Amino acid sequence: MSRPASSNPPGRSPLRRGALTPTLIVVAVAVVGFIFFANVWTDVLWYQQLGFFEVYIRENLARIITFLIGFAMMFAAVFFAIRIAYRSRPVYAPDAEARDNLNRYQAQLEPVRRVVMIGLPILFGLFAGSAAASQWQKALLFFNQEPFGQADPLFNMDISFYLMSLPFLGFITGFLISIAVVAGIAGILTHYLYGSIRLMERGIFTSRAAQIHIAVTGALFLILLGVNFWLDRYTTVQSNSGRWAGALYTDVNAVVPTKAILAVAAGLVAILFIIAAIIGRWRLPVIGTAMLVITAILAGGVYPWVIQQFQVRPSENTLEKEFIDRNIKMTRAAYGLDKIDVSAYNATTTATTGALAADAQTTANIRLLDPNLISSAFAQLEQYRPYYQFPQTLNVDRYMVDGKVQDTVIAVRELNPDGLSANQQTWVNRHIVYTHGYGVVAAKGNKFTADGKPEFLQSGIPSNGVLGNDTSYEPRIYFGENSPEYSIVGAPDGAPNREQDRPAGREGGGETQYTFSGNGGPNVGNWLNRILYSIKFQSSDLLLSDGVNAESQILYERNPRERVEKLAPYLTVDGNAYPAVVDGRVKWIVDGYTTSQYFPYSQPQQLQNATVDSQTSAGRTVALPNSSVNYIRNSVKATVDAYDGSVNLYAWDDQDPILKAWQKVFPTVIKPYSEMSGDLMSHVRYPEDLFKVQRELLGRYHVTDPDSFYQNNDAWSVPNDPTVSEAVKQPPFYMSLQMPDQEKPAFQLTSSFIPQTVNGSARNILYGFLAADSDAGNVKGVKGESYGKLRLLELPTDTQVPGPGQAQNKFNSDPTVSQALNLLRQGASDVLNGNLLTLPVGGGLLYVQPVYLKSTGETSYPTLQRVLVAFGDKIGFAPTLDEALDQLFGGDSGATAGDSDNNGQTPTSPPGTTPPPAGPTDAKADLKAALDEANKAIQDGQAALAKGDFAGYGAQQTKLSEALKKAIDAQARLDATPAPTATPGATPSATPSPSPSS
C-alpha cells in the first residue's frame, strides 16, 4: 500500500514549524528575565558596596509584602465570588425558552470558563497589588509610629494618629471597599451569565443562592462604608476646602456629626442586608439603602451648605475666630515657626555720619562677590583645561582665615567630558581615562583684587591655599553634580596609571596620571558583573574593553542629591548640595527633610511653588518636587564624599517623630549628630528650601491675632528679584550678619518682605526682614545654641524704608550713576548688576550691590568695578564698598569694609553732590584720553586671549579698569561745569543690564 504524499515542503517537518513559536517565546522571556535580573543584581551590589543593603532589603520587602497582600486579597475575593456564583448556578430552568438560552450561554462560555475564572482574578490582583505596593511607606510608618506628645484641638488625638495611622487606615478602608465592589460586580455578572439572575417580564428573577451572595457582599460593603464615614470625621481637621485649613465652624457643627450619623446608618442598613439573606425578603434593605442615600445627600451635603451660607457667612469673622486661631497655631508649629523671635524695628532712613560704628564687624564681612556672576571668572582664571568645569552658580560658605571667620564663595573643579575634542570622544577616554575633577577653588566673599578679580583663598593646580594643599586634603572629585554617568577605575598593584589626573603645570606642562585607590563602587572584575553592568548601561565596550581588570570598580549614581535620595527614599532632599573641605576630604553636604501632608489644621504648601525663585527659574538650582506638604523638618544632614562616594546620614532633628519612626524601620543607617566632627559642624548651614517654605508662610502667619488674620490687611510678600527681567522671587542670601539682639555676627540666611502683592502690584517698601541663624558651632557633636533661630524684624506699617525694587530703581535712575555706567559700557562691554543685599545696620536698612563689567568676547569674564549702596533716600557709588559707604554716611561711615585695602584711587563724588570745579577743556581732553586707553586695553586684551596669553589678558583688564576710572572722574568734572558738553561716544542707555543674583 502506498503512503499519501506529504503536503509539507521537503526538509521541513510539522514538529519543527510548530516548535518555533514557543521557542521564540521562551527565548524572549529568558532575555527579559535576564535584563530584570541584571538591574536587580546591580542594585544589590551598589547598596552592598555603600553599606546600605538594609535599606534595599527592607524597602523591597515592604513593597513585595504589600503587593502580595493586595494581590492575594483581590484575587481571593474575585475568585471566590466567581466560583461561588458558578457552583450555585441553577441546574435547570423553569421554562423551555429560559433553558435554551441558558444552555446557549453555557455552551459559549465553557471553552474559556477556566481561563476567565483564573485570569480575571489575576488581572485584578495585579492592579490591586501594584496599588498596595505604592503605599509601602504608609504601611511602615503605621507599624513603627512614634507619638508627637501633642494633641489636635478637636478630637484630642495625638498628632501621630493623623500622620501615621489615619493615612494607612484610610487607604485600607478604600482598598477593601474597592475589593468589595469588584468582587460584587464579578459575582453578579457570573450569576447572570449562568442563570441565577434573569430579566423576566414579571421582573427580575434571583435564585436563593444569588440573593444570599448579594446580601452578604452588600452588607460587607456597607460595613466598610460605615468605617469610612467614621474615619472621615477625623480627616476634617486635614481639610483644605475652606478659606483656612482644618475643621472650621461648619465642619465641626455639621459635617462631623453628619459623618457619625451616616456611619451608624450604614451599619444598620448592613444588618438589614444580613436579615434579608436569612429571610429572603428585600424590602427592608432596599428602603434602608434609599434612606441612606437620601440622608447622605441631605445631611452630608445640603445641611452643611445651609449652615455655611445662612449662619456662617453673615457672621464669619466671629464664628470662625476660634478655628482661625487653631489654624494659626498649628501651622506655625508644623513649619517650625512657633518659636520665632519677633522684634519691632523702627528703622531710620537718615544716613548720619558714623552710623555704622556699632556694626563694624558686619560691615567688614559684607559680601561683594555674586556667586551667580562670578562662575565665569572662576572658569577663565582656574579652569586650566577644557575638560574641567565649574557650576553655573557657586556656593557661599565660611572658613576660618587668620583666626577670623571669612565668608567664602566656593566651588569644585569638576570633570566635563563634553569639553574633550572630537578626536578624544572615545569610550575609553570618557569612561576610563577622564574620570574625575580636581581641586577646590575658593575666594573671599568681601574682597577683590585691584582689577576686580576674585581674591582667591584656595586655587591652582596643584591645589594650594588656606584650605590646604594636595597632601593635606584629597582634591580629586569623583562624585559631583556634573560627574559622568559612570567611570571604570582601579587597577592591580604595579599596573600603570591610566586615569588623567591633572595638568602638570599651568601652560603646556603635560599631564599626570593616577589610579583610584578607594572603595567607590561595585567590583566589575569578574565576568558576571561585567555582563550585568554591560546590560545595565547598554554598552558592549564595558564587556570587551581590556581597560577593565580584576580590580576594576564602576562608579555611578554620582550626583550627591540623587545618591542621597536613593539611599533615603523617605526624605525630600534640598535642591542645593554644597561642597566643603572637611577633615581632609571634600564633602558634599546635603539637607534632607521629613514631610507630611496630614498635620491637623496646618496650611498646605506646594513645595515647588514655595521654592521657586530667580535661581531655580534660571536652572541654577533645583526646585523641590510639585508635592503638597503641611509639615516639614530638616531632620537629616547627609554628607557624600567627593572622592569615594561614601554617604553618611546624621539625625539632625533627633526629636522629629517621623524620623524616629524611620529609624525604627532602618535602625543602622542613620547616625546620631553627636558623631559629626567639629570641622563638619562648622560648615553646616540652615537649608535654603526650608527657609523658602517658611518665609512664604510668614507672609501671612507673622500675624497671630485671629481678627487681624481674618482681615488680611497686614499680609506680606517676598519681593521679586530686581536684578532679573522676569517677575520671580528674590532668593535668600547667606551672609555674616549681626542682628539687633545679637552680640556678634553669625552666618545667617536672610530675606526681606514687602506688602502683599495684589493683582501683580505692590508698594515696594520694606515691612519685614527675616534671618535664620546658620552657625552650628565647631565642637564635635554639639549644636550651637542659636543654630536654627529665626529672627524677624517688623517695621512699622507707615515705614518709608524702600524695598529692593525701589532701591534698584533709585540706582538705575540716578544721573551720576547712569553716566558712569554708560562710560563703563564703552568698548563693547556689558554692565551686570550683582546680588542686591539687604542688611539691618545703622539703625535702618542698608542696600549693597556690586556692579560688574564684562566685555562681550566669548572668553571674557565679569570683573567688579563699582559698588552701589543705599540707605533711605540716599545712595553712594564708588570703586569700593568702603568708599561708597563713606559717601553715603557723610564722609565717614564709622566702619571699615572688607575691601578697604583696595582704596587708594581718587574717589568719585557721591551722587547728588557737586564735585570741585575744573576746566571743561582739561576734562574733555582727559575723558578722550581715558576712553582711548580703555579701547586700546580691550583690543590688546582680546589679542592676548586669542593667543592663549591669560597673563597678558589679565594685565590688559587691569589697564582697562584704571582707564575707566579715569574716564568716570573726567566725566564727573565735566558734569560740574556751568555748561556741560555731551560725552563723546556715550551710550544713550542708562539702565544697567539685569543679571541673576544669589
From Swiss-Prot:
InterPro entries tied to this protein: UPF0182
Biased composition (Basic and acidic residues): 496-509
Pfam family, one: UPF0182
Biased composition (Pro residues): 908-919
UniProt keyword terms in alphabetical order: Cell membrane, Membrane, Transmembrane, Transmembrane helix
Keyword Membrane recorded: yes
Region span, Disordered: 490-518, 888-923, 971-998
One CC-aspect GO term: plasma membrane
Superkingdom classification of source: Bacteria
Compartments where found: Cell membrane
Entry's family note: Belongs to the UPF0182 family.
Protein name: UPF0182 protein AAur_2732
Organism lineage string: Bacteria, Bacillati, Actinomycetota, Actinomycetes, Micrococcales
